[in-house]
Amino acid sequence: MSIAAVAMVLNEADIIETSIRHLFAEGIDEMYLAVGECDDNSWNIIESLDLPIHMYHDTDEVWHQAAWTNELIARAGTDGHEWIVPFDADEFVYATNSDSIADTLADCPHDNLLLHQWGHHSWGAREVTPRTQPKVAFRYSFGVTVSMGAHACSLPGGQWDVLDIREWQFLSFDHFCKKVRTRIATLDPVERARGNGWHMTRFDGKSDEEMRTEWEAIQAIPTIADPIPSRLPPGLGLVGQA
């Protein structure tokens, strides 16, 4: 049994090493990443890691997330991986039973997993209520595809409470502004017309002052003390570590 993680990456230098190392600590075997035209050093950070990562350069100005993710899934499946775990750079997948992802999937009888997505305001502060849309992880079969954002896949059914995700989407107010505006500028117009990316496009055209109000509203969402579950050893100097 082998597991591949797949993701698109754009301007995630602040957190990408942490999320990558987290998944490998969970027993992921290989990773397939489409890295966009970053204006930070995301590419160099990933390239410098001594880990089994396949990197592909996404030179398109438009964020074709579903198409790229499905291409990465197909490549991972062709390479023989049984399980596929899509993720975003700001997401941390974990097993709800406290075992590693690898140990959990080795004994999993299900083919399509639905993951609760819990928002974080810091490494240790989790929102009380999960996001409305799930994420997916699944056993590979030829032709399987996911929707934009990997909120659904083409396999039937779906089992909750095997894996979940913690998402630390915005690290600071400045990070919030830059990330939102970059995502809006690169969003596929076709996907936007379908209503996808609404969690970003709802901020379109807002001034810095208006964005500050939105940031404060996000920070006011109730949280509890519940750190991101991770097998990362302390002292690596990664995001969230003292």
Regions found by a protein language model. Give the residues of each.
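Active-site-proximal specificity loops/subdomain of glycosyltransferases
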Residues: 41-86
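The conserved acidic donor/metal-binding loop of glycosyltransferases
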Residues: 88-93
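N-proximal low-complexity "stem/linker" segments adjacent to membrane-targeting elements
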Residues: 1-24
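Catalytic-site signature of metal-activated, phosphate-bearing donor transferases
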Residues: 66-70, 95-242
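A structural signal for isolated positions on well-ordered beta-strands in alpha/beta enzyme cores
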Residues: 4-6, 30-32, 54
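Short beta-strand/loop segment that forms part of the nucleotide-sugar
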Residues: 29-37, 57-58
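Short acidic/polar active-site loop segments enriched in Thr and Asp
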Residues: 29, 82, 111
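A generic secondary-structure signal
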Residues: 22, 71-75, 104
